[in-house]
């Protein structure tokens, strides 16, 4: 399926992949529930495609956010509003800008996804020299931070980077 975004351009789209099967009458159907959440990949035939849901839930929705800066009206709270059409932008885009999300309690984090938006981009074709570099830290108390993900040397374009952690992480702040 294609998901319409149409924020930068009227035909701007994203690809959506949903579990699909045939019912007893041979009619094809898809399960789009929790369509942007992690799904289990079946290793064989599945009797009920609803069983592909991992059970992992979005922990950041509507949670408090702080940032080093913001550009114009692109407020940090946009990061946790779960809208594909809103986003946060730091004022400069230079190293040292940061964003912090409070999960408002100790939570078990199993995966992290960052979705970048091409704010103020003027490039129309794929640029091989543009890529996303970042680090993700976590903290239980908001004072002592440990590195979770290090993509500071990344040389790939990852506008929707999904990182599944090797082990679940108990944390309060990211």
Protein language model annotation of sequence segments:
Residues 41-106, 117-129, 150-153:
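Disordered, acidic Ser/Thr/Pro-rich linker "stalks" and the adjacent N-terminal cap
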Residues 11-14, 59, 130, 170:
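A short, structural micro-pattern
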Residues 19-21, 102, 138, 164:
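Short, well-ordered beta-strand micro-motif
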Residues 62, 109-111, 131-135:
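Exposed beta-strand and adjacent loop surfaces of beta-rich binding modules
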Residues 99-110, 165-170:
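Extracellular and analogous surface-interaction loops
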Residues 93-96, 118-174:
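Trp- and acidic/polar-enriched beta-sheet ligand-binding modules for extracellular glycan
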Residues 3-5, 68, 115-117, 137-139:
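Predominantly extracellular/luminal cell-surface or secreted proteins
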Residues 3-47:
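Beta-rich carbohydrate-recognition and catalytic domains
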């Amino acid at each position: 399926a294609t998901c319409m975004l149409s924020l930068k351009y009227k035909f701007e789209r994203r690809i959506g992949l949903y579990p699909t099967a045939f019912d007893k009458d041979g009619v094809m159907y898809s399960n789009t529930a929790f369509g942007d959440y992690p799904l289990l990949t079946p290793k064989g035939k599945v009797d009920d495609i609803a069983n592909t849901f991992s059970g992992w839930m979005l922990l950041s929705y509507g949670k408090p956010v702080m940032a080093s800066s913001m550009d114009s009206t692109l407020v940090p709270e946009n990061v946790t509003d779960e809208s594909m059409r809103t986003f946060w932008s730091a004022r400069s885009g230079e190293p040292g800008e940061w964003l912090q999300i409070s999960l408002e309690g100790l939570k078990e984090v199993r995966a992290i996804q960052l979705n970048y938006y091409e704010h103020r981009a003027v490039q129309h074709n794929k640029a091989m020299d543009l890529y996303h570099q970042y680090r993700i830290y976590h903290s239980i108390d908001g004072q002592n931070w440990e590195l979770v993900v290090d993509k500071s040397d990344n040389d790939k374009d990852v506008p929707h980077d999904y990182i599944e952690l090797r082990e679940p992480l108990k944390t309060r702040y990211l």
